[in-house]
Amino acid sequence: MCEANAYIIKDGKEELFMQNVDKLAPDGDMLLLEDIFGEKKYFKGYIKELALVEHKVILVEN
């Protein structure tokens, strides 16, 4: 499987925000993440890093 997990940087550590992310798209001033089951979450921040081999998306809050 090629899904990624999305993490938020808090206090210098990675905190899991969403598992099995299938889609990530800008939506106004937010990011929309959708997992393989169709669950959607919105995030106010930006992408710091995409670690594709590790299947990780690193996010930072605004």
Language model: regions and residue ranges:
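Compact, glycine-rich, soluble single-domain proteins
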Residues: 2, 6-62
